Amino acid sequence: MTAYKGEVFNLPPDKSISHRAALIGALADGTTEISNFSGGFDNQSTLGVLQACGIRLSQDIVQGADGRQTRHVVLHSSGLWSFSAPDAPLMCNNSGSTMRMFAGILAGQPFDSTLVGDNSLMKRPMKRIADPLRRMGAGISLSPDGTAPVGINGTRDLKPITYELPMPSAQVKSLVAFAALHADGESRVIETLPSRNHTELMLDLKTEALSDGRRAVIIPGGKSLEARPFHIPADPSAACFMIALGLLVPGSEILLRDVCLNPTRAGYIELLIGAGADIGFENRRVIGGETIGDIVVRYSGSVEPLRIDEPSIVANIIDEIPMLAVFSACATAEFELHHAAELRTKESDRISAVVSNLQRLGFLCEEFPDGFAVKGRQRVPSGKVILESYDDHRIAMSFAIADKALESELEISDREIIGVSFPNFFDIIESLRQ
């Protein structure tokens, strides 16, 4: 089995921070420069809807002193109400982040608009974004199934709100925050379980610990935002796949540079370390409120099976669960997950997708409404095994890593979907081959 060794300087820039940097730049008064912006399809969708609403922006590939090429985005805006009515429905493609968070901005604009997406996105639930925006005074329409198209009758007279998140959701928290910036007065978002906090950090929002253990995010309304520069670190959700590769393949040692180590994003790494994975950190520092550092990964021949059953943990590793499940199955033939029904509403039903593919590889699985378990491997398939991507980039990447770790010949359908978030996925893997 081929070992994978070397340094990775070109992991994809963080998707979550890239989305937010572009949206905040469009809301700020002045010129916003974003270095190392993501070139993935989802983040390009965000730039596309901004341009369709009249925001002036440019993006260029620049070469740094170290020879690396990165994407530099510049946005020009005059503030919160710089947007103009689009000529057609706004195409978000496959990006749920674009659709949900941009809805919060459009709710505060004095025109009507409609958000649409590809076939996958048009099936995803959008009721969760309608309730807070309607309570603030915007008109929101959905399909009879509660999905897109999302019709928005915006207004400059949004009311402030105190909104309790019914479930952990950084996207809903962010859309309420973006809408609340346009309101006349202070708004609060109450969360019982923490979710990723990039929006709070990037907007420099105050938070308050409540007596019952919950947390309030405080958003002042009607105040101008000043443009500021942003630098986008490497995406920890993308790093997850290279970490799994290094842990699973004998003889491997991989160094991942400049990765976002925000505690609300790197919880999966602590899970892996707790299971016995050989993972270390170097060069930790804080830039723009975000903790960034290098991750060192070495092959770990003996790890404990992963069992994930705490809602507070699930909320902050939801994107990494497919890879964690495949990792644990490949390493130990065991895995167990509960309290993750949210996975069924992602780009695919990720619970069923992971279970189906693992079963094709001979693993014994039990599926629950909110998770699943892997209980050993009954057989090793002979010949080529064709696995489904389910048009889901994270499913495709998770099983592409399994292809390197298992003694089976695997083929993944429609693997081009990986370009949604990780265009150079296979290039990096090939560069690490020894």
Curated annotation (Swiss-Prot):
List the active-site residues: D319 (proton acceptor)
EC number annotated for this UniProt entry: 2.5.1.19
Which GO molecular function annotations are given, in alphabetical order? 3-phosphoshikimate 1-carboxyvinyltransferase activity
Give the keywords, sorted. Answer: Amino-acid biosynthesis, Aromatic amino acid biosynthesis, Cytoplasm, Transferase
User: In its keyword annotation, does this UniProt entry include Transferase?
Assistant: yes
Hey, which pathway is this one from? Metabolic intermediate biosynthesis; chorismate biosynthesis; chorismate from D-erythrose 4-phosphate and phosphoenolpyruvate: step 6/7
Chief subcellular location equals: cytoplasm
Family, similarity comment: Belongs to the EPSP synthase family.
In Swiss-Prot or TrEMBL terms, this protein is called 3-phosphoshikimate 1-carboxyvinyltransferase
Organism per entry: Prosthecochloris aestuarii (strain DSM 271 / SK 413)
Gene name?
aroA
